[in-house]
């Protein structure tokens, strides 16, 4: 017979899986976007669902990285991103992500993914290049997500 705690844990796990699936759908849609802004907006939607899933599953490094990515993409969409702000966001991700990391090398994968995408999104208007960077990021996130069971 299942205890209340086991039932609660399973409910949280299943809810996190639903949020992860919705996020995955949004990132897939973003890869077909016709403009950089549209791509960024779909990614923000993905990040919101994925951050919630990471928090539910104890993936704090991932949730932090995603939260900063929401800020980054929002500033990009509003055309308010500067090199200084981008540098500050990257430094915050590295420092706080390292502090919150409880998974060793695996915990650094979201940080690496986000920093590489931050640099790519800031330096190229080429959507095809950004799609390739998204694939690289998805591979890093896949390893992280499998570890936290997202």
Q: Model-flagged regions — what are they?
A:
Residues 2-150:
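Alpha-helical membrane-protein topology signature
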């Amino acid at each position: 017979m299942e205890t209340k705690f086991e039932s609660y844990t399973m409910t949280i796990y299943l809810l996190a899986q639903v949020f992860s699936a919705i996020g995955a759908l949004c990132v897939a849609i973003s890869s077909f976007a016709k403009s950089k802004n549209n791509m960024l907006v779909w990614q923000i939607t993905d990040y919101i669902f994925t951050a919630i899933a990471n928090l539910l599953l104890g993936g704090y490094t991932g949730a932090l990285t995603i939260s900063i990515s929401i800020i980054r993409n929002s500033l990009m969409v509003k055309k308010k991103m500067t090199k200084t702000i981008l540098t500050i966001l990257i430094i915050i991700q590295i420092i706080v992500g390292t502090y919150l990391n409880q998974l060793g090398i695996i915990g650094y994968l979201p940080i690496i993914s986000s920093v590489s995408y931050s640099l790519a999104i800031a330096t190229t208007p080429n959507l095809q290049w950004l799609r390739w960077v998204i694939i690289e990021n998805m591979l890093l996130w896949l390893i992280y997500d499998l570890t936290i069971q997202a």
